[in-house]
Amino acid sequence: MAFLKKYLLTILMVFLAYYYYSANEKFRPEMLQGKKVIVTGASKGIGREIAYHLAKMGAHVVVTARSKEALQKVVARCLELGAASAHYIAGSMEDMTFAEEFVAEAGNLMGGLDMLILNHVLYNRLTFFHGEIDNVRKSMEVNFHSFVVLSVAAMPMLMQSQGSIAVVSSVAGKITYPLIAPYSASKFALDGFFSTLRSEFLVNKVNVSITLCILGLIDTETAIKATSGIYLGPASPKEECALEIIKGTALRQDEMYYVGSRWVPYLLGNPGRKIMEFLSAAEYNWDNVLSNEKLYGRWA
């Protein structure tokens, strides 16, 4: 667009001002009251704590994981804590058909959807990579492909509610760590896909926020067991982590960080990347792209 280049500096200044202003907006628990929320990977750990926080805030919650028995306990506790409603649907995110059907069923149970929190994860044993392609494939299926499938299935409802997606990721999706190549690859993929999708939403005026949640080591049973005797860094509390995920998503932040050091967000939250992405978008002929819906497609 010609006007974009003509007023590039002005637009960039407004963009940066909005970016920093939004980061200072205050969270209020009542933001979640009555909201309809899906939480994946919710039978234990961070996902379970997210469900409990949402319940205390008066949200409608549908949780999923593989363990039916564990989910039943989570739902019972959510109702005790004050959830407007709570349901579970058990299944595996290795099954893409289940992932797609789960979203539709959850939407029917709640009568819509305001927030999709993608928290499930497949951990691999910490080891050097020696060509175990099956580990890479499984990591990408569960930690990346299923996130995309769930998001696509949820989009009609989220567009109607102008809702939000939380993509729970890791510092290992921003920088490299030895011994976790398949896991790290899936987390880098989340950043690449969902950050690009966010920019496409902006161009297409789709009012659905995407929050990439960058986590360090959290004191979940699974994470501590996987890293015991190998990784010496501190583990942060899962209860507080879960609350920060909800806050960042409710405030529609592009990224939220919950890591052991307060300096990490400043080191990884790269403003230079934001500026470069903005400048690269100015090189597109958006008039041509947006006027040719048949060729380029659009979210309807």
Curated annotation (Swiss-Prot):
Recorded GO molecular functions are: 7-beta-hydroxysteroid dehydrogenase (NADP+) activity; cortisol dehydrogenase (NAD+) activity; NADP binding; protein homodimerization activity; steroid binding
Q: What class of enzyme is it?
A: oxidoreductase
Membrane-topology descriptor: Single-pass type II membrane protein
Its GO biological process terms? lung development; steroid catabolic process
> Keyword annotations for this protein?
Endoplasmic reticulum, Glycoprotein, Lipid metabolism, Membrane, NADP, Oxidoreductase, Signal-anchor, Steroid metabolism, Transmembrane, Transmembrane helix
Q: Which Pfam families match?
A: adh_short
Glycosylation is annotated at N207
Which residues face the membrane's Cytoplasmic side?
Answer: 1-7
User: Its catalytic activity?
Assistant: an 11beta-hydroxysteroid + NADP(+) = an 11-oxosteroid + NADPH + H(+); cortisone + NADPH + H(+) = cortisol + NADP(+); corticosterone + NADP(+) = 11-dehydrocorticosterone + NADPH + H(+); a 7beta-hydroxysteroid + NADP(+) = a 7-oxosteroid + NADPH + H(+)
- Source taxon at top rank: Eukaryota
Q: Which GO terms describe its cellular component?
A: endoplasmic reticulum membrane
Where, per UniProt, does this protein localize?
Answer: Endoplasmic reticulum membrane
Tissues expressing this chain: Widely expressed in all peripheral tissues, with highest expression in liver, followed by kidney and lung, and very low expression in heart, lung, spleen, stomach, small intestine, colon, skin, skeletal muscle, and ovary.
Would the keyword rRNA processing turn up in this protein's UniProt record?
no
Q: What is its EC number?
A: 1.1.1.146, 1.1.1.201
The entry's active site is Y183 (proton acceptor)
Positions with a binding annotation for NADP(+): 41-67, 92-93, 119-123, 183-187, 218-222
Family to which the UniProt record says this protein belongs: Belongs to the short-chain dehydrogenases/reductases (SDR) family.
Q: What is the annotated quaternary arrangement, including any partners?
A: Homodimer.
Physiological role: Controls the reversible conversion of biologically active glucocorticoids such as cortisone to cortisol, and 11-dehydrocorticosterone to corticosterone in the presence of NADP(H). Participates in the corticosteroid receptor-mediated anti-inflammatory response, as well as metabolic and homeostatic processes. Bidirectional in vitro, predominantly functions as a reductase in vivo, thereby increasing the concentration of active glucocorticoids. It has broad substrate specificity, besides glucocorticoids, it accepts other steroid and sterol substrates.
What is the protein's given name?
Answer: 11-beta-hydroxysteroid dehydrogenase 1
